[in-house]
Amino acid sequence: MNIHEYQGKEILRSYGVAVPNGKVAFSVDEAVEAAKELGSSVSVVKAQIHAGGRGKAGGVKVAKNLDEVRTYAEEILGKTLVTHQTGPAGKEVKRLLIEEGCDIKSEYYIGLVVDRATSSVVLMASEEGGTEIEEVAEKTPEKIFKEVIDPAVGLQGFQARRIAFNINIPKELVGQAVKFMMGLYQVFVDKDASIAEINPLVTTGDGKVMALDAKFNFDSNALYRHKDILELRDLEEEDVKEIEASKHDLNYIALDGNIGCMVNGAGLAMATMDIIKHYNGDPANFLDVGGGATAEKVTEAFKLILSDENVKGIFVNIFGGIMKCDIIADGVIAATKEVGLEIPLVVRLEGTNVELGKKMLKESGLNITAADSMADGAQKIVSLVN
């Protein structure tokens, strides 16, 4: 689950991590009032959406007086920002962060991620702050420094100091930088975050180390024990179909293609998307119905896929282990009848009760194309859609 920058900064502030003073605003008048209350000679007007690249898209402006705050707030609020992370549709700005300006001396990148290779949390840092870390990793990987954190003891002071020296934090500010990193790590662990990025971390003219931006992603599986984090969820920033999917315990991610996919198991779902691409098709979604799908769940999955008007065909690819193929066949038949399916449907079944499942599909009298293998199914649905 993602949260907004201003929410992330409030969490950091509660842990004693330095961030600029700021206030959230939902209207132009609120933005002006916030700037007035902050009383800074320079204010920063920042669009709040769940995506990076806001500055390049015109979503971050520096205002030197209240009139400029009003002008920029009017310009940004209601605007659709298109960045490299929003996709071509972009995201509409519905709230702003009004923040005190600061005298920036240097910019850095600090991030915490879960590293699958080491099964540990890794602290990453670079003196190339303010730019996309992916670009730094690709062009100058030697400028990224990492510390693998032992979960038994947590981030150690010597590790944070080593990072600070490696990215050339001024010696007189190393103590502040270490305190910052230790606080950030504590937030990461306490709140079950999966990503925490500060880009940029800055040093200022008056000798401070603070977060100028904050991005957090939290493990959705742990939200049951973090009611405070769950309250920060902004449903308007999420895909409506993904919200609906979560209500029915379906794992759904919308994509840009025209072939709907319904699969059981994340690995098989990814392989299904890959093989559709291999045969020159474009998957419209990732949809994992899980191991215990019922006929009702399959019906909801169909409705979800068909809610995407770009879908021109559906490929059902099921391996019946825990879930029997005849149960899936029953669900597919019921769903096809209920939604009045009018687009091509290809079904590939394998596993427990596969012959019974295939027999049920064949005798249903519905326009369902059977596939003998995953490759056969992918070829058939691509051919039918094209």
Curated annotation (Swiss-Prot):
Reactions catalysed: succinate + ATP + CoA = succinyl-CoA + ADP + phosphate; GTP + succinate + CoA = succinyl-CoA + GDP + phosphate
SUPFAM superfamilies membership: Glutathione synthetase ATP-binding domain-like, Succinyl-CoA synthetase domains
GO molecular-function terms, A-Z: ATP binding; magnesium ion binding; succinate-CoA ligase (ADP-forming) activity; succinate-CoA ligase (GDP-forming) activity
Keyword Zinc listed: no
GO cellular component annotations of the record: cytosol; succinate-CoA ligase complex
InterPro entries registered for this protein in UniProt: ATP-grasp, ATP-grasp_succ-CoA_synth-type, ATP_grasp_subdomain_1, SUCC_ACL_C, Succ_CoA_ligase-like_bsu, Succinyl-CoA_synth-like
Keywords from the UniProt entry: ATP-binding, Ligase, Magnesium, Metal-binding, Nucleotide-binding, Tricarboxylic acid cycle
Ligand binding (ATP): K46, G53, R54, G55, E99, C102, E107
Domain ATP-grasp per the UniProt entry, residue ranges: 9-244
Gene3D superfamilies given in the database record: ATP-grasp fold, A domain, ATP-grasp fold, B domain, Succinyl-CoA synthetase domains
UniProt pathway: Carbohydrate metabolism; tricarboxylic acid cycle; succinate from succinyl-CoA (ligase route): step 1/1
Pfam family, one: Ligase_CoA
Entry binding sites for Mg(2+): N199, D213
Swiss-Prot/TrEMBL cofactor(s): Mg(2+)
Function of the molecule: Succinyl-CoA synthetase functions in the citric acid cycle (TCA), coupling the hydrolysis of succinyl-CoA to the synthesis of either ATP or GTP and thus represents the only step of substrate-level phosphorylation in the TCA. The beta subunit provides nucleotide specificity of the enzyme and binds the substrate succinate, while the binding sites for coenzyme A and phosphate are found in the alpha subunit.
Record-stated family: Belongs to the succinate/malate CoA ligase beta subunit family.
NCBIfam families xref list: PRK00696.1, sucCoAbeta
Subunit note: Heterotetramer of two alpha and two beta subunits.
Protein known as: Succinate--CoA ligase [ADP-forming] subunit beta
Organism, scientific name: Shouchella clausii (strain KSM-K16) (Alkalihalobacillus clausii)
